[in-house]
Amino acid sequence: PTPWTHGRDLWWHDTVTTASPHHHAQPFDAEHPLFILYTSGTTGKPKGILHTTGGYLTQTAYTHHTVFDHKPGHDTYWCTADIGWITGHSYIVYGPLTNRTTQIIYEGTPNSPTEHRHFDIIEKYGVTIYYTAPTLIRTFMKWGRQIPDAHDLSSLRLLGSVGEPINPEAWRWYREVIGAGRTPIVDTWWQTETGAIMISPLPGVTAAKPGAAMTPLPGISARVVDEEGKPVGHGETEANGYLVLDQPWPSMLRGIWGDPQRFHETYWQRFAEQGWYFAGDGAKLDTDADLWILGRVDDVMNISGHRISTAEVESALVAHHTIAEAAVVGATDPTTGQGIVAFVILTAHTQPTPTLIDDLKTQVAHEISPIAKPREIHIVPELPKTRSGKIMRRLLRDIAEGRELGDTSTLVDP
């Protein structure tokens, strides 16, 4: 605990009684620090990301308005994120308040008091825009469609996804079951570091594809390049692309608090010669030049010289009717360099059969390639996740390789 410092620390009840109900806005420099937000790092130690006032407010307001096609006075908007996560900062607090948004703010679990909780809220308040994470969509899938089907969700006109790549199976379920087959889905790519949405379909403009991030927003410049910084060709299927941002954007991070060296090494060193920001994510362009995010580069496995994305293998596993959620890691293998180890959660009421593991391996081989067939598949009740819903593959890799677990401070349930 931090010791009390007289003169610095104040009791809430002592200050609030004398506080004025009126507030007069004060001007600040555009580069005035706005907040520091800690995000999980691949090395285990969280990074303090610094954002500043002017550019951050500009881009959160712009993206909230355009990506969600927000209409003040007509829409009821609900972003389900935790306010302490960047999505909550940008798309519950700053963006919506700037745009005069009528919104739902909910604190609690999606299954308390029952698994109908979110759908009760959508129905009761006539939610029109619903922005959530793939991990929650997969949870809804695991519970079964009979729960959303029991509700009138016809008020919904736009669905959003954030936090990690959404696999095509979950995307289709989200659109068909929650969106009744008629709502656009904006699958948004951005990071704590970028401050606001960078890559996303635009409703009414972009013909979306299940699982694809599609194109950078107007004013944003992104490329997919190989290890040498050369453009990746359209339709190259192996996970050989790196997502880089080659032009500045308003809400970009200004540094890692107290650690300029780590700031340089993490984001700028990889493509220092070109002066590009390296997002740490793998990506590919399909034959239409649409952009697909393949997850963290440290989540790209090298199997017998073939680079295979964890996101692709996870999508292949979840496409099997018995699987609600999957996480895949590359574990050291004496023969192939890395071997694929998968952890899967079964859908509700599914019992494992003697052939299930073999069936799943066959499914992956059929969907991707025999090279992508997992070496091991473990059926588990839960997956380790950060408080923002991201699967902590680093911990799964430690488990797969029999190592001691590293820093678990950002875990939901250490």
Residue ranges and their predicted role:
Residues 57-76, 86-128, 142-146:
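Conserved AMP-binding/adenylation subdomain of ANL enzymes
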Residues 46-48, 59-67, 119, 137-144, ...:
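Adenylate-forming
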Residues 33, 39-42, 64, 77, ...:
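Conserved S/T- and glycine-rich ATP-binding loop of Class I adenylate-forming
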Residues 215-219, 230-270, 308, 404:
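Conserved ATP/PPi-binding loop(s) of AMP-dependent carboxylate-activating enzymes
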Residues 123, 130, 249, 254-255, ...:
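AMP-binding/adenylate-forming catalytic core of the ANL superfamily
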Residues 4-38, 45, 69-76:
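Conserved pre-ATP/AMP-binding loop-to-beta segment of ANL
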Residues 82, 163, 190, 214, ...:
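Active-site glycine-centered loops adjacent to acidic/histidine catalytic or metal-binding residues
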Residues 77, 94, 98, 128-132, ...:
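Gly/Ser/Thr-rich phosphate-binding loop
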